[in-house]
């Protein structure tokens, strides 16, 4: 590798000796590869078209055959072949064939021809070195076989793996489509603080930092919820934020400590209204990104055509295990029944509601392949959701599961400040007892609720997991350009 780099550095010097700057300032590529391919698809084999073209990109392959040479040049949209002929280029032919390597960025001007083999080509009349690469590209046939290297050196992955480029193109389309869908319905995006004096809005461990001037401990936000609700109190009736969230938790194919979510709040709505909003928005996004509402994920066809299945957590657990949690008078009875069914009974699940959630996560969650809204969660695991209008002990909350993964979470928001204080104080007691993910009491948020918050439906969608679905990606690292990785060595 060091010898190859030295050779390329020698070529940098040679280019300068010949009056060619190896690191150019600018070039005007008037044409893109994909557009050339489509606009000139009718050019017959063996014929030329006398139209001036200018393209720029990275040299992916090169073949020198005596007085002829063929390069493959790639830009963001695709590739095109360069046809180089000594008779036409003169001394420049020797320069380009001896000093340009695979990986270099060059610009060329010329005309179009289609080879006898049917390959549309730019017949090069002049060339410009734009950037001399000092490192070789990965093998073009095998790409980056080392998956971790794909994540560590994403720039190489993007150069040699078209599917990776398509994944991030679709991610960008997904984000744009979500914002457009919400904007068209008069939702207003307002940015909320990333650095917060109180980490709230979710059960998660925060990252902690310190403001030197104020001598103040601060947290990277674990959710945007509490500040967006303050905005609803302030009179913004339809508000959202799409942005980064930070949670000091484990790394897996489903979790990255830094991830993207969109949270949406609509005054005078409830969780049933959020169901309609969620399935309508996601179906629309899928149509725009994938061309329809049916797609294949890891070999399984997924149908995102609304309406989607709705079922309560109690119904799904009973369907999967035969256990009716409404019949249990206390935790001991629920634990005994779960043990008899071979379900785990962790000590931290200290109530019937928490055991119901454990049974759901163990026996149901992974089997929810087609989009399913799971409704009506236990109150003790949902401290920010409104009590159910007709089911004691439950709240008006749903989670959306697709391919066995939670993709969205929504509530009829809790707007009673007294009830909210009691729930947050219970959370704070759990934190004091050692639960690092329990929330604390945010006094300013409670004061905002006391000013008065209208009935509100709230929704959060994990953008990364949604993009995994829309790009058929098995790992969250595949859809985050630069995922967090353990340092090498």
Swiss-Prot record:
Top EC class of this enzyme: ligase
Catalytic reaction list: tRNA(Lys) + L-lysine + ATP = L-lysyl-tRNA(Lys) + AMP + diphosphate
GO terms of molecular function: ATP binding; lysine-tRNA ligase activity; magnesium ion binding; tRNA binding
Residues binding Mg(2+) 2, per UniProt: 406
Keywords: Aminoacyl-tRNA synthetase, ATP-binding, Cytoplasm, Ligase, Magnesium, Metal-binding, Nucleotide-binding, Protein biosynthesis
Obligatory cofactor(s): Mg(2+)
A Pfam cross-reference name: tRNA_anti-codon
Main location group: cytoplasm
One cellular component (GO) term of this entry: cytosol
The protein's Enzyme Commission number: 6.1.1.6
Cofactor note: Binds 3 Mg(2+) ions per subunit.
Residues reported in the UniProt entry to bind Mg(2+) 1: 399, 406
GO biological process, one term: lysyl-tRNA aminoacylation
Locations listed in the record: Cytoplasm
CDD domains recorded: LysRS_core, LysRS_N
Record note on quaternary structure: Homodimer.
Family: Belongs to the class-II aminoacyl-tRNA synthetase family.
Protein name: Lysine--tRNA ligase
Protein's organism: Synechococcus sp. (strain WH7803)
């Amino acid at each position: 590798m060091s010898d190859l780099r030295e050779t390329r550095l020698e070529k940098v010097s040679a280019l300068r000796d010949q009056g060619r700057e190896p690191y150019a300032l600018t070039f005007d590529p008037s044409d893109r590869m994909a557009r050339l391919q489509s606009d000139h698809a009718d050019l017959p084999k063996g014929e030329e078209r006398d139209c001036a073209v200018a393209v720029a990109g990275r040299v992916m392959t090169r073949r020198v055959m005596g007085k002829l040479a063929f390069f493959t040049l790639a830009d963001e949209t695709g590739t095109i072949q360069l046809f180089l002929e000594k008779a036409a280029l003169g001394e420049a032919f020797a320069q380009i064939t001896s000093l340009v390597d695979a990986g270099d960025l060059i610009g060329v001007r010329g005309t179009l021809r289609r080879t006898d083999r049917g390959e549309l080509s730019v017949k090069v009349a002049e060339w410009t070195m734009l950037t001399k690469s000092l490192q070789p590209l990965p093998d073009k046939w095998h790409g980056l076989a080392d998956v971790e290297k794909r994540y560590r050196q994403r720039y190489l992955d993007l150069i040699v793996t078209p599917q990776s480029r398509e994944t991030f193109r679709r991610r960008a389309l997904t984000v744009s489509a979500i914002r457009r869908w919400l904007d068209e319905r008069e939702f207003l995006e307002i940015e909320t603080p990333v650095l917060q004096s109180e980490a709230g809005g979710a059960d998660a461990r925060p990252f902690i930092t310190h403001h030197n001037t104020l001598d103040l401990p601060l947290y990277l936000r674990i959710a945007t919820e509490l500040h967006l609700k303050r905005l609803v109190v302030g009179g913004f009736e339809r508000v959202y934020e799409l942005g980064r969230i930070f949670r000091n938790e484990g790394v897996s194919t489903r979790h990255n400590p830094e991830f993207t979510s969109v949270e949406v709040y609509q005054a005078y709505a409830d969780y049933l209204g959020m169901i309609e909003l969620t399935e309508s928005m996601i179906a629309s996004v899928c149509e725009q990104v994938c061309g329809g509402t049916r797609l294949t994920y890891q070999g399984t066809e997924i149908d995102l055509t609304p309406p989607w299945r709705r079922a309560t957590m109690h119904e799904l657990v009973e369907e999967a295990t035969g256990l009716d949690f409404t019949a249990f008078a206390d935790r001991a009875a629920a634990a005994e029944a779960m043990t008899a069914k071979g379900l785990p009974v962790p000590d931290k699940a200290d109530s019937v509601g928490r055991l119901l959630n454990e049974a759901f996560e163990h026996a149901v969650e992974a089997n929810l392949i087609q989009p399913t809204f799971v409704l009506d969660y236990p109150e003790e695991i949902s401290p920010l959701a409104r009590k159910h209008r007709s089911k004691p002990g439950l709240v008006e909350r749903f989670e959306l599961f697709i391919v066995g993964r939670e993709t969205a979470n929504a509530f009829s928001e809790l707007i009673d400040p007294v009830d909210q204080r009691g729930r947050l104080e219970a959370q704070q007691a759990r934190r004091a007892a050692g639960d690092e993910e329990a929330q604390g009491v945010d006094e300013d948020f409670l004061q905002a609720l006391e000013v008065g918050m209208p009935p509100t439906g709230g929704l959060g969608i994990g953008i990364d997991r949604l993009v995994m679905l829309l790009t058929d990606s098995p790992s969250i690292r595949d859809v985050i350009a630069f995922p967090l990785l353990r340092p090498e060595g």
